[in-house]
Amino acid sequence: MAQDVLAVVMARGGSVGLPGKAVRMLLGKPVIGYTFGHVRESRLITGTVVSSDDAEVLRLGREAGLEVIERPAELATATSATDPVLRHAVRALYGEGAARPAAVVMLYGNVPVRRNGMIDRCIEMLFATGCDSVQTVASVGKMHPYWMFDRKEDGRIRKHVANDVFRRQDLPALFSPTGAVYVMRTEVLLGGEG
């Protein structure tokens, strides 16, 4: 598999829940530093860029020897979608008509833990299956919608999804994104304008 793969490490500076979370120290290094390490461990990533509106994130990216792109303010709000950020990064690095990578790996800079080889397994799965994208997921386990409740106006609760499932073993398998790794074909990413 000799195809170019671009990793885009994304970290916004304006987090409301935990300001500066990507640059906070965790066991002696900034949280985003763990993502930089994961990128370096990949055998398949051929280029990496850090996309951020935060000067400290960009500084850390430069210190790690990575390319950096200052993200425009309109792509750095709490409601900004990720695809436009990824498209911005690809277009900033590869001009019109230039050869572009076959795939883009989106990595959140505030995710310090990823299993060994996880990024490469996702990239390999993308190319081996011919699918448009791959993302990491985890079982919802006991937090299954079948076992969730709505609260009515009078304060009583009722099952959110009507069902007669009482044993965990009988729950249909459902999964939730972990946010650890997203990989997509560049042509699909760029074709999904709008």
Q: Locations of the language-model features?
A:
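N-terminal glycine-rich phosphate-binding loop and ensuing alpha1 helix
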Residues: 4-51
